[in-house]
């Protein structure tokens, strides 16, 4: 047997076929085991960008199941806390880490170079801790008081959060030459943003009705304003700021989708 035959036999089998980018998005954005994918390559993750909202839908579906189970056992407040914890665990806290690093840097009021250095530091400062407390507390509070709207909110918010990442990657320049943003932009293909946006628009309408479309519009507005601020402040966006965009977008989505009477009427 030749060495080429041996290598061929040992090569992992790609079960996903043309849907491999969806698997790559899940592998990158969650802790879910994703068997049957080839070894991760530099271009694999950027080429999965148009499927980030689909990965968000998977996250939302899992959270819906967790929330249903928690609701059977406990009251709405406990269910909300369980959901927020499960949310962080399911995504390995990746976006939360970016949130804390971003606010430690941009709220330090130092030079651009010093802010980027602070964001590289793995230690959490006061501003990062405050940002984490605010985001986690708001998520739990919105879900605890959502009534029946919690289900729509928890399914759709991760979709809108991942779309915010796609918008940030496509719309704003990377702050570092060798950073994650540069890697993403190097492999962007025509139609990536359009594909992600069409999927997000459809999911927002199907899951949330008119309320979902309003949530998407508000997420876009906040994401754009934050992207402009951080681009002016840092010279572009980084992997940390993408995480922050996702977390803040999720809070905006939850705030909109859990408005008591108006959003429930619009969703019907």
UniProtKB/Swiss-Prot annotation:
It comes from the Bacteria. It catalyses: alpha-ribazole + adenosylcob(III)inamide-GDP = adenosylcob(III)alamin + GMP + H(+); alpha-ribazole 5'-phosphate + adenosylcob(III)inamide-GDP = adenosylcob(III)alamin 5'-phosphate + GMP + H(+). One of its GO terms (cellular component) is plasma membrane. One of its GO terms (biological process) is cobalamin biosynthetic process. Its EC number is 2.7.8.26. Keywords: Cell membrane, Cobalamin biosynthesis, Magnesium, Membrane, Transferase, Transmembrane, Transmembrane helix. It is found in: Cell membrane. It is an enzyme of class 2 (transferase). One of its GO terms (molecular function) is adenosylcobinamide-GDP ribazoletransferase activity. Its cofactor is Mg(2+). Signal peptide: none annotated. Pfam families: CobS. Its main location: membrane. It is a multi-pass membrane protein. The chain crosses the membrane at residues 54-74, 80-100, 124-144, 150-170, 202-222, 243-263. Pathway: Cofactor biosynthesis; adenosylcobalamin biosynthesis; adenosylcobalamin from cob(II)yrinate a,c-diamide: step 7/7. Belongs to the CobS family. HAMAP family: CobS. Joins adenosylcobinamide-GDP and alpha-ribazole to generate adenosylcobalamin (Ado-cobalamin). Also synthesizes adenosylcobalamin 5'-phosphate from adenosylcobinamide-GDP and alpha-ribazole 5'-phosphate. This is Adenosylcobinamide-GDP ribazoletransferase. The lineage of its organism: Bacteria, Bacillati, Chloroflexota, Chloroflexia, Chloroflexales. The gene is cobS.
